[in-house]
């Protein structure tokens, strides 16, 4: 996705050789037009897969996931990092480690919203080590639902996330692949 790649290169801030900050358009302030294009691109990639639910994790995955759900015309469901007082029982849970925050959280999804008939597209903002997507896939499995694929907005191709997801049998579609953050510069896959 060319417009996303341009945005990542122009507005992304390299924190170090493994961390890219995209707060200006994805993780804090959201570029709605770009997220609409992201959602539409995910739709084009998975439109024939019979998707019934989009699943993400709060908070940064919500913007691209909601736009994808708009284009698919299916509900968007997000795993919560804290159990709300309104949810007494009947939920799936798993532990997910955040690469960026270096913190493990137990996330939950209500059984009310995810079931065996669902065909799920997992969407996340970043792919680093793959822990978030693997955790969400675990929740899908607990529901006896089917993960059709994983849609990633920005993949850090120099980390092992894609390999871990593919080793788990998951199809991965990434819209922007970052090859390197060396020299305080974003280099996309395929660039010299």
Swiss-Prot record:
Xanthine binds at residues 20, 27, 156. 5-phospho-alpha-D-ribose 1-diphosphate binds at residues 128-132. The gene is xpt. It comes from the Bacteria. Keywords: Cytoplasm, Glycosyltransferase, Purine salvage, Transferase. It is an enzyme of class 2 (transferase). Converts the preformed base xanthine, a product of nucleic acid breakdown, to xanthosine 5'-monophosphate (XMP), so it can be reused for RNA or DNA synthesis. It is found in: Cytoplasm. One of its GO terms (molecular function) is xanthine phosphoribosyltransferase activity. GO terms for biological process: purine ribonucleoside salvage; xanthine metabolic process; XMP salvage. Pathway: Purine metabolism; XMP biosynthesis via salvage pathway; XMP from xanthine: step 1/1. SUPFAM superfamilies: PRTase-like (SSF53271). InterPro entries: PRibTrfase_dom (IPR000836), PRTase-like (IPR029057), Pur/Pyrimidine_PRTase (IPR050118), Xanthine_PRibTrfase (IPR010079). Belongs to the purine/pyrimidine phosphoribosyltransferase family. Xpt subfamily. It catalyses: XMP + diphosphate = xanthine + 5-phospho-alpha-D-ribose 1-diphosphate. Its EC number is 2.4.2.22. Homodimer. It comes from Staphylococcus epidermidis (strain ATCC 35984 / DSM 28319 / BCRC 17069 / CCUG 31568 / BM 3577 / RP62A). This is Xanthine phosphoribosyltransferase. GO terms for cellular component: cytoplasm.
């Amino acid at each position: 996705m060319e417009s996303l790649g341009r945005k990542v290169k122009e507005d992304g801030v390299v924190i170090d050789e493994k961390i890219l900050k995209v707060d200006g358009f994805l993780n804090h302030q959201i570029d709605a037009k770009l997220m609409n294009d992201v959602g539409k691109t995910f739709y084009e990639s998975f439109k024939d897969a019979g998707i019934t639910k989009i699943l993400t994790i709060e908070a940064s995955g919500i913007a691209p996931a909601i736009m994808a759900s708009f284009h698919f015309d299916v509900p968007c469901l997000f795993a919560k990092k804290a159990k709300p007082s309104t949810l007494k029982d009947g939920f799936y849970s798993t532990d997910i480690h955040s690469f960026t925050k270096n913190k493990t959280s137990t996330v939950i999804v209500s059984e009310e919203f995810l079931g065996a008939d669902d065909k799920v597209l997992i969407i996340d903002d970043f792919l680093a080590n793959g822990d978030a997507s693997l955790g969400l896939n675990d929740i899908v499995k607990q529901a006896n639902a089917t993960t059709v694929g994983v849609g990633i907005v920005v993949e850090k191709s120099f980390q092992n996330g894609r390999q871990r997801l593919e080793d788990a049998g998951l199809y991965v579609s990434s819209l922007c692949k970052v090859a390197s953050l060396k020299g305080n510069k974003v280099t996309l896959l395929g660039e010299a």
